[in-house]
Amino acid sequence: SHSKHHATYVKGANDAVAKLEEARAQEDFSSILLSEKNLAFNLAGHVNHTIWWKNLSPNGGDKPTGELAAAIDDAFGSFDTFSAQFHAASTTVQGSGWAALGWDTLGNKLLIFQVYDHQTNFPLGIVPLLLLDMWEHA
């Protein structure tokens, strides 16, 4: 069922691309905005789920080691503090969305933030590392 759910976003993105191409060919510019919004939603749903699937592991659950552990300690003081802040971010998403841990390429540090719906509204310069699906179906 999870793969079918994810496939819906891929199909939605592909359909939106086809509708964009058709609207451009017909110079139907009023339809382009809706198709672009649908593309953003479905493509972000695909990307967010792709990252989320990679975050899951049957052997996971231990604290990170190496560079990630050092970056967490540097940004949050400890893994326990990071975990508490990430938990708070995930449980306070209003409506549908995601909790996210990302690398701020401008500030060179980790940040925790919320993503609403699927619009992939990551701050500019952020590389997403960890996503937690907080949609109702999750």
Swiss-Prot record:
One of its GO terms (molecular function) is superoxide dismutase activity. Its EC number is 1.15.1.1. Its cofactor is Mn(2+). The keyword Manganese applies. Binds 1 Mn(2+) ion per subunit. It catalyses: 2 superoxide + 2 H(+) = H2O2 + O2. Mn(2+) binds at residues 2, 49, 133, 137. Disulfide bonds: none annotated. InterPro entries: Fe/Mn_Superoxide_Dismutase (IPR050265), Mn/Fe_SOD (IPR001189), Mn/Fe_SOD_C (IPR019832), Mn/Fe_SOD_N (IPR019831), Mn/Fe_SOD_N_sf (IPR036324), SOD_C_sf (IPR036314). The keyword ATP-binding does not apply. Keywords: Manganese, Metal-binding, Oxidoreductase. It is an enzyme of class 1 (oxidoreductase). Destroys superoxide anion radicals which are normally produced within the cells and which are toxic to biological systems. Belongs to the iron/manganese superoxide dismutase family. This is Superoxide dismutase [Mn]. It comes from Mycobacterium szulgai. The gene is sodA.
